[in-house]
């Protein structure tokens, strides 16, 4: 009995069984059984948005399901993994849950697939890291008046050693590229810069130049501009106020005095004073009432005389 047991040998494994070191076993994805390898087929259709499609095998004319995760070598210019409709691909056939599936999908001979024409391309200029641009220096690139350069910058440039000056001169310059300061870019469309003091002085009478020239302190202040869209400052010639009898002499005296003084001291009249009632109306009302009483007495006297005569 013991000799017969020793002579009996264990059954040999099947020839088609796969060893763990075989390439077919290595090609299995998630312990899936490999049906065929290096099979050529034509893509029937592939949905880039959903990420799946079907491949028609050239040998058996069978449709094989393919998922975007099964694509091994994708087109490097494409952003997503995909295969194009009608493209010839090479793949392995494995057994899936619902039927045959494709795995290790590549182009013929192991080249990358072409990909679908509906798949998004990668950005062309992002392949290599960007070069860091030099720091923006608005005073160098946009300087209309050389005398307006700040003193601190000129003093710093004089005190800087020669080595730093050479490094600043070696900075690359980009021809044809003009950089503007940030405040200029914001007011670029549909807005004009505020008037300077020289422009305000040259304007004629009745305009903004004469109105904005107030006292000696107001001439040096910069013009304040409203940056809200659709704002229109209402600046027009001031309307003349009705002149009374008592104020004619005063205005004549004030005009003669103003002609002697320079025009720069004239200031814009505050419009809030128009709403206030003038205080000089009371004595005038008294004079008018007295004149009315006197005229009434005069008219009553002739009537009385006529009645006596009758």
Curated annotation (Swiss-Prot):
Gene Ontology terms describing biological process:
chordate embryonic development; egg activation; embryonic morphogenesis; epidermis development; establishment of RNA localization; miRNA transport; mRNA processing; mRNA stabilization
Tell me, what is one Gene Ontology molecular-function annotation carried by this entry? miRNA binding
Q: Where is this region: Disordered?
A: 1-31, 102-310
Effect of deleting the gene: Embryonic lethality caused by early gastrulation arrest: maternal mutant embryos fail to undergo normal cleavage and the maternal-to-zygotic transition. Early embryos show severe developmental arrest at the shield stage in maternal ybx1 knockout embryos, leading to lethality at 8 hours post-fertilization (hpf).
- Lineage, top-rank taxon, reads Eukaryota
Annotated compartments: Cytoplasm; Nucleus; Cytoplasmic granule; Secreted
Concerning PROSITE patterns, the annotation shows: CSD_1 (PS00352), CSD_2 (PS51857)
Record's CDD domains? Answer: CSP_CDS
Give start-end positions of Basic residues composition bias. 124-133, 176-191, 265-279
Q: Where is the composition biased (Low complexity)?
A: 1-29, 292-301
Q: Which Gene3D superfamilies match?
A: Nucleic acid-binding proteins (2.40.50.140)
InterPro entries noted in UniProt: Cold_shock_domain (IPR050181), CSD (IPR011129), CSD_CS (IPR019844), CSP_DNA-bd (IPR002059), NA-bd_OB-fold (IPR012340)
**What SUPFAM superfamilies does the record tag this protein with?**
Nucleic acid-binding proteins
Q: What is its main location?
A: cytoplasm
SMART domains linked = CSP
In chain numbering, the residues marked as site (Important for C5-methylcytosine-recognition) are 45
Keyword terms of this UniProt record: Cytoplasm, DNA-binding, mRNA processing, mRNA splicing, Nucleus, RNA-binding, Secreted, Transcription, Transcription regulation
Has the keyword Transcription regulation been applied to this entry?
yes
An annotated GO cellular component = extracellular exosome
Q: Where is the CSD domain?
A: 38-107
Protein purpose: DNA- and RNA-binding protein involved in various processes, such as translational repression, RNA stabilization, mRNA splicing and transcription regulation. Binds preferentially to the 5'-[CU]CUGCG-3' RNA motif and specifically recognizes mRNA transcripts modified by C5-methylcytosine (m5C). Promotes mRNA stabilization: acts by binding to m5C-containing mRNAs and recruiting pabpc1a, thereby preventing mRNA decay. Plays a role in the maternal-to-zygotic transition in early embryo by binding to m5C-containing maternal mRNAs and preventing their degradation.
What family does the entry list?
Belongs to the YBX1 family.
Domain comment quoted from the record: In the CSD domain, Trp-45 specifically recognizes C5-methylcytosine (m5C) modification through its indole ring.
Instruction: Give the record's subunit note.
Output: Interacts with pabpc1a; leading to pabpc1a recruitment on C5-methylcytosine (m5C)-containing mRNAs.
Name of this chain's protein: Y-box-binding protein 1
**What species was this sequence derived from?**
Danio rerio
Q: Which gene encodes it?
A: ybx1
